[in-house]
């Protein structure tokens, strides 16, 4: 089945610092060209006799298939990353960036600097979720064939000249700044949620499975500050600073972390703890599900981080 081009998910006339002419040309010619090239390569592969085709020809076809496939997919992610104000994001998305980079601004600074460093050359800068560690990383890619094994790209910046030359000439830095001002964090967050849920699903604990485990409340600091209760015996730890407290936890004891609903905050924290060699799981349904089931809670103590 042939791949089909996807329409721009935003009004190209509405972006700041990126003209409709540039965006339409990029979409129609470069992205559209990648889709057409991929379909042509697939058609040729469908009629190829693998037994009689010389190895160098087959290698060439498969190499070009990879290049065209990633060009199509990364362009789709690039366009799907635009249409916002560059700043507005869900608190849980900000937490994920802070937990991985030390702060949202720090993440942005590194990402933009990586893009500007590619100016005059070519390649991509990607914000990628790495499931092994439950973290986010800004990934460098010199062309369409570089990828973090097992990672899920969430945000893409195209640094090939076709992405900016019509508007900015050789001023790649101005283009990067314009891109950063137009990022739509809502779909980035949705992709992050899906990636975290897929990676963490095997590590969920039901309410009946928490007995005997060390309980860690990892609700966001702002949410926890407004809370009045916790699970009995739990202690609070900041999910934005896992690397600062993970080493304090016992390696010979099962851990269960919980957030409000059992979504990406608790799940990503469990993944990070597991990457540190700990037997960590997240509580399915979070404290909300626990309370809805009529399970007991305790008042939040004066020192919620202390060992019970």
Residue map of PLM features:
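Feature for soluble, non-membrane regions of globular proteins
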Residues: 1-200
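Flexible, polar/low-complexity N-terminal or interdomain linker segments that lie immediately upstream
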Residues: 186-227, 299-308
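Conserved protein kinase catalytic core
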Residues: 223, 291-292
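Short amphipathic alpha-helical segments
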Residues: 226-230, 269-271
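Short, structured coil segments at secondary-structure junctions
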Residues: 230-232, 276
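Short, hinge-like loop/turn segments at secondary-structure boundaries
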Residues: 232-233, 297-301
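Short acidic-hydrophobic, aromatic-tinged amphipathic segments that line or gate anion-handling sites
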Residues: 237-238
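Catalytic cysteine-centered active loop of the rhodanese-like fold, especially the PTP/DSP P-loop
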Residues: 242-291, 308
């Amino acid at each position: 089945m042939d791949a089909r081009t996807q329409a721009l998910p935003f009004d190209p006339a509405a972006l700041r610092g990126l003209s409709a002419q540039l965006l339409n040309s990029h979409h129609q010619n470069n992205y559209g060209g990648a889709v057409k090239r991929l379909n042509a390569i697939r058609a040729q592969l469908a009629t190829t006799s693998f037994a009689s085709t010389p190895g160098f020809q087959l290698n060439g076809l498969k190499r070009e298939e990879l290049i065209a496939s990633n060009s199509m997919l990364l362009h789709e992610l690039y366009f799907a990353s635009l249409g916002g104000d560059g700043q507005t994001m869900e608190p849980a998305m900000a937490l994920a960036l802070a937990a991985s980079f030390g702060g949202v601004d720090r993440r942005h600074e590194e990402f933009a600097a990586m893009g500007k460093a590619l100016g005059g050359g070519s390649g991509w800068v990607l914000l990628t979720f790495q499931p092994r560690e439950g973290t986010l990383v800004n990934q460098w890619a010199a062309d369409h064939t570089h990828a973090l094994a097992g990672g899920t790209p969430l945000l893409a910046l195209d640094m090939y000249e076709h992405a900016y030359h019509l508007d900015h000439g050789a001023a790649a830095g101005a283009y990067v700044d314009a891109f950063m001002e137009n990022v739509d964090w809502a779909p980035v967050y949705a992709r992050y949620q899906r990636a975290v849920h897929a990676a963490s699903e095997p590590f969920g604990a039901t309410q009946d499975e928490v007995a005997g485990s060390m309980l860690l409340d990892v609700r966001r600091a702002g949410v926890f500050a407004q809370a009045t209760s916790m699970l009995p015996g739990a202690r609070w730890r900041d999910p934005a600073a896992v690397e600062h407290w993970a080493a304090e936890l016992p390696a010979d004891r099962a851990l269960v972390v919980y957030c409000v609903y059992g979504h990406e905050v608790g799940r990503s924290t469990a993944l990070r703890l597991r990457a540190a060699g700990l037997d960590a799981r997240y509580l399915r349904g979070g404290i909300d599900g626990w309370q809805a089931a009529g399970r007991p809670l305790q008042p939040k103590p004066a020192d919620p981080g202390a060992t019970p």
